[in-house]
Amino acid sequence: MCIRDRTYRLPDDGDTRERAVCNACHTIHYENPLNVVGTIPVWGDKVLLCKRNIEPRFGKWTLPAGFMELGETVAEGAARETREEAGAEFEMGELFSLMNVTRVGQVHFFYRARLTSEHFDPGHETQEARLFAEHEVPWDELAFRTVKETLRRYFEDAHAGQFQMHHVDIE
């Protein structure tokens, strides 16, 4: 694969950003952000969290989420990840948060979701799927800052009685 021997430089095509350029065939390889998609599944006043059975952050709690696949929309990916990780039955809601994580080249999207059952069948990436009231959330054991920020905003909106879309830049 030619990308193994690459140099980051301005391509000869007038581009204004440095790109990965193959030293052998001069092909420009565009490296773009990855989308992480998930949900905030809710049963009454409780949210569903998944305890990770994979790295990174093995054993930490997270919302059901993962990388978007080719051929699916953001919402389809979020629904798929929720089924795969939590084995949850739910109805998709509106987009709740969009978080730019430029440090790692990712954009995280979380949708609200209403659980239609409190029974879960987690997949192999999840040790345990469990419902938490706000005061029970293991805040210091959350896997990712985007999850913590999304949950914090979710509970703030729930207390206010009105949900809004949140756009956040995380350094």
Map each language-model feature to its residues.
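Short, non-ligating residues that shape and space the ligands of small metal-coordination modules
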Residues: 7-11, 31-32
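Intrinsically disordered, low-complexity segments enriched in small/polar residues
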Residues: 6, 27-28, 59, 109, ...
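Unchanged
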Residues: 68-91, 95-153, 157, 161-163, ...
